[in-house]
């Protein structure tokens, strides 16, 4: 049986994205980060809404239209409407951060 916490490489030069399921407009991804962040001045501007939860580790998101960043720890989730510009400011370097992202 597949497991979200299996097959996580010890070293990750960049984020690891794995599509777990895709049907019509819905896509479910596992994202693994380990001390990663978005490049300077880069903003995600996605055509699809995204719902994301942190399953392991911790992260900080920044939304272009918000004055303060959003810190996420295990169990925290956020809905990101389509075209709401955001970036990953930080993921913990202490352990892999495992996200589950659902694009709607």
Residue positions per predicted region:
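A short, N-terminal "cap"/entry segment at the start of jelly-roll beta-barrel domains
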Residues: 1-43
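A short beta-strand-loop-beta hairpin characteristic of the jelly-roll/cupin
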Residues: 39, 44-46, 51-74
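Ligand-binding loop in jelly-roll beta-barrel domains
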Residues: 73, 82-104
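Residue-level recognition of conserved beta-strand positions in structured domain cores
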Residues: 30, 56, 63-65, 82, ...
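Short strand-connecting beta-turns/loops that link adjacent beta-strands
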Residues: 25, 66, 93-95
């Amino acid at each position: 049986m597949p497991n979200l916490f299996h097959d996580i490489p010890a070293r990750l030069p960049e984020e690891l994205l794995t599509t777990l399921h895709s049907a019509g407009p819905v896509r479910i991804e596992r994202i693994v980060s380990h001390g990663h962040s978005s490049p300077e001045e880069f903003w995600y501007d996605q055509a699809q809404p995204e719902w994301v939860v942190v399953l392991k580790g911790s992260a900080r998101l920044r939304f272009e239209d918000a004055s303060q960043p959003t810190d996420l720890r295990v169990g925290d989730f956020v809905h990101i409407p389509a075209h709401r510009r955001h970036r990953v400011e930080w993921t913990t370097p202490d352990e892999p951060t495992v996200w589950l992202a659902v694009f709607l």
